Amino acid sequence: MLSPKGAILIFFLTGFFLSIIILVLNYLLSPKSKSLIKRETYECGLETIGPTWVQFKGNYFMYALVFVLFDVETIFLYPWAVRFNVLGLFAFVEMVIFIGILVLGLWYAWKEGALEWK
């Protein structure tokens, strides 16, 4: 019988090698553009004027980061809410502290202007 550590090792190795195989297959099977005209920037059928590399401000970045933070909070809150009656007062106090830390982080992000559109 395989030990639990061996099963976890096999799981990670399988995931790693499947990822490598998929990347190699993607490289081998993807179309290759050999001609220079296929590498040119296409902009509404016209040749580009000026530099084609334009950097955009990432205004949505902070919103996405805050969303991911509170999405992960939901992942941690759900099992606690399902087993609320069984866990008792200690788990309740732990969750209040956890939510308090997250509210403190939200307040700090709000204070620093991370949630304001600029």
Curated annotation (Swiss-Prot):
Give the source species. Carboxydothermus hydrogenoformans (strain ATCC BAA-161 / DSM 6008 / Z-2901)
UniProt keywords, alphabetically: Cell membrane, Membrane, NAD, Quinone, Translocase, Transmembrane, Transmembrane helix, Transport
Q: What is this protein called?
A: NADH-quinone oxidoreductase subunit A
- Subcellular location(s) of the protein: Cell membrane
Q: What is its EC number?
A: 7.1.1.-
Translocase in keyword set: yes
Membrane topology listed for this record: Multi-pass membrane protein
Under the cellular component aspect of Gene Ontology, which terms does the record hold? Answer: NADH dehydrogenase complex; plasma membrane
Subunit structure comment from the entry = NDH-1 is composed of 14 different subunits. Subunits NuoA, H, J, K, L, M, N constitute the membrane sector of the complex.
| Taxonomy of the source species | Bacteria, Bacillati, Bacillota, Clostridia, Thermoanaerobacterales
Q: What does this protein do?
A: NDH-1 shuttles electrons from NADH, via FMN and iron-sulfur (Fe-S) centers, to quinones in the respiratory chain. The immediate electron acceptor for the enzyme in this species is believed to be a menaquinone. Couples the redox reaction to proton translocation (for every two electrons transferred, four hydrogen ions are translocated across the cytoplasmic membrane), and thus conserves the redox energy in a proton gradient.
Name the residues that span the membrane.
8-28, 61-81, 86-106
